[in-house]
Swiss-Prot record:
The keyword Ribonucleoprotein applies. Belongs to the bacterial ribosomal protein bL12 family. GO terms for molecular function: mRNA binding; structural constituent of ribosome. PANTHER family: 39S RIBOSOMAL PROTEIN L12, LARGE RIBOSOMAL SUBUNIT PROTEIN BL12M. GO terms for cellular component: cytosolic large ribosomal subunit. The keyword Ribonucleoprotein applies. InterPro entries: Ribosomal_bL12, Ribosomal_bL12_C, Ribosomal_bL12_C/ClpS-like, Ribosomal_bL12_oligo, Ribosomal_bL12_oligo_N_sf. This is Large ribosomal subunit protein bL12. It comes from Francisella philomiragia subsp. philomiragia (strain ATCC 25017 / CCUG 19701 / FSC 153 / O#319-036).
Amino acid sequence: MSITKEDILNAVAEMSVMDVCDLVKMMEEKFGVSAAAAVAVAAAPAAAAEAAEEKTEFDVVLVDAGSNKIAAIKAVRGATGLGLKEAKDAVEGTPFTVKEAASKDEAEALKKQLEEAGAKVELK
C-alpha cells in the first residue's frame, strides 16, 4: 500500500510549526530548491501594484494640438507661461511635456483645460 497525498497532508496537519519548518528545510536540502525564492516571486507583482497605486506625480504631455491650434497655443501659454512663439513651437512640435511632476489634481485640471481647447493630452 502506497502513501497518498491525502495521507501526507493529514500528517503535516498534525505536526507542530517547528516540525513543519524542519520538514521544509529537509526538503530544500534533498531537492536542492529554496522555498524563499518562490515567496519572493509571488510577492513581486503585489509590490509593483502598490507602486502603481502610490503614484502621486504626473507628467502632462500634449500629444496632439487638435483642429484648433490657436486655442491649444493659448492653453499652453496659460499653463506654462511661455511666450507666443515658444508656445506655438511647442504645440506644433508635439509631443510636448507641458508640466512635469504635477500633483494628481493639478495634472487632471491641466488635462481638462487642454482638452477643452481641443488638444489630445496624456498623463504619464
